Amino acid sequence: MDKLTIQASPPLAGDVIISGAKNAALPILMAGVLAETDFVVSNVPNLRDVTTSCKLLRCLGAEVTELGDGQIRISTTNLNEFCAPYDLVKTMRASILILGPLLARYGTADVSLPGGCAIGARPVNLHLHGLEMMGAKIEVKEGYIKARVDGRLKGAHIFMDMVSVGATENLLMAAALADGETVIENAAREPEVIDLANCLIAMGAKITGVGSATLRIQGVERLQGCNYRVMPDRIETGSFLVAAAVTRGRIRCLKADPASLESVIAKLEDAGAKITTGEDWIELDMQGKRPKAVNIKTAPYPGFPTDMQAQFCVLNALAQGTATITETIFENRFMHVPELIRMGATMELEGNTCIIQGIESLSGAQVMATDLRASASLVIAGLVADGKTIVDRIYHLDRGYEHIENKFQGLGAQVVRTQ
């Protein structure tokens, strides 16, 4: 099993090119099922979850062609299977996003209950309740969601009990081909949801309210393929910015989207970073200074993203002062904390809050990645820890970061992948 070996590194310096967003690419790939003609997606990152998504589409009978340079073409002409099996779904929660498209276009879908990162109960009931309101008959048995609808799904007025990115995306895709108008209230407003909506509009969907908490979708009878470019990955961008801040360096993230990262940029500025942005780049310069502690409370967009919480735990571990980080989105999302404590961090958990006393330095250790973003935080910690850090189980990292060791090496870090 691969691992990363990290030596204490100098301040990061240079340019890093940001990949396409995993959390936008996965639903957009699933949306290919809705299109009657060829659909080409570009700026798709080369990640394990993307590979799994392509396998899932092929398993359904779709023709998936990797055109190189981050481009994937999807043709559904021969799609004739409607079951997403356990062996694929268990490795990737986003597989649930095939449910809405299959049901909307073909009237039938069997999807295994999902797996993915083990960071608490992320229930699928919001997805199922919304589809039932649109006329689907759903039963869960033998570990599968079995959904059917006679004819087309029907437009409905859906109020989401809680903000859910995945459920918003699933219902948005289903509603695009439904009969009549669907209104989704308390919809997720994340940039990745906006990206999916813009993609569906390019395919011929009629959607208004994009970027707001109320989405209105006037269903159409058919959608066509299009060429669509996936947005930049804001979490990858944020991870590199935090790494630069922790190492007191100066880097520039290219092919980025500053507008999608306002809450993270604000916190980095609070920590003492000098940040400059252009239309598609962000520069962070710590001017050699140690970061200052910053309090964080995760929240749905436009609040502070839960996917950046672990990285800021590391920043605060090495910052001047004491900070609290409160996690409001997922329970059980502080699994990186015991590993950081093993590296010498002064942290204490109280319920869903982590209290962190900043110290001057960490010590290298053998640590274990438990989920995608936790693994990124351990790599960042290794960059500033005295001695050698080995991060095991980095298959988590490969689910969300493209060529992470190469990108860090390009910024001057000593990071090597080994068997």
Curated annotation (Swiss-Prot):
The modification 2-(S-cysteinyl)pyruvic acid O-phosphothioketal is found at C117. Phosphoenolpyruvate binds at K22, N23. Keywords: Cell cycle, Cell division, Cell shape, Cell wall biogenesis/degradation, Cytoplasm, Peptidoglycan synthesis, Pyruvate, Transferase. Coiled coil: none annotated. It catalyses: phosphoenolpyruvate + UDP-N-acetyl-alpha-D-glucosamine = UDP-N-acetyl-3-O-(1-carboxyvinyl)-alpha-D-glucosamine + phosphate. One of its GO terms (biological process) is cell division. Pathway: Cell wall biogenesis; peptidoglycan biosynthesis. Cell wall formation. Adds enolpyruvyl to UDP-N-acetylglucosamine. Belongs to the EPSP synthase family. MurA subfamily. This is UDP-N-acetylglucosamine 1-carboxyvinyltransferase. It comes from Shewanella baltica (strain OS155 / ATCC BAA-1091). The gene is murA.
